[in-house]
Amino acid sequence: MIYGSLDHGFIEVIVGPMFSGKSEELIRRIRRAQIAKQKVQVFKPAIDDRYSIDKVVSHNGSSINAISVTKASEILDLLEEDTQVVAIDEIQFFDHSLVDVVREIADMGKRVICAGLDMDFRGEPFGVTPDIMAIAESVDKLTAICVKCGNPATRTQRLINGKPAKYDDPIILVGAHETYEARCRKCHEVPRT
């Protein structure tokens, strides 16, 4: 993790599978910035309404207020001039215009902290996340614990009716009754049809 001066913007990214503590780490960094009396704005995609529309919420229940946006460009529209730290959760749900938005905010001299899944349920790069990682000064890849064997988990297993989702299933399911588990490379299953 990098801490620059207030006149030097930079980008931090927190990635990993579900249940690895990404949102929890994002919230921790936001709270530290607030303790340091820095003005923080937090954004999240409107599609992420699992726990709350106007909060970033971790699986352990920690939460922090957030502004819900439907597209990346809204972040620039809502960004206040005196904001020093911008946090964006669930970056994988944004389109690729987020790359330019994040770059522009950092070029304004602001600290940008992004969090999201680096791989989809197939174990493949997820959305805009790899491109944000490429332009970041700092990337932290977190792991969870594999529910099958207990080893470090780097993947998210999607289960539908208790069975691994198939490779051809949609990447993003909104409002579906799927469940997810953290899995290691060996235990991660994605059947091809």
Curated annotation (Swiss-Prot):
Keywords for the protein's UniProt record, in alphabetical order: ATP-binding, Cytoplasm, DNA synthesis, Kinase, Metal-binding, Nucleotide-binding, Transferase, Zinc
Disulfide bonds: none
SUPFAM superfamilies: Glucocorticoid receptor-like (DNA-binding domain), P-loop containing nucleoside triphosphate hydrolases
Residues binding Zn(2+): C146, C149, C184, C187
Pfam families xref list: TK
Quaternary structure and partners: Homotetramer.
Annotated family: Belongs to the thymidine kinase family.
Matching PANTHER family: THYMIDINE KINASE, THYMIDINE KINASE, CYTOSOLIC
Protein name, entry field: Thymidine kinase
Originating organism: Caldanaerobacter subterraneus subsp. tengcongensis (strain DSM 15242 / JCM 11007 / NBRC 100824 / MB4) (Thermoanaerobacter tengcongensis)
Gene: tdk
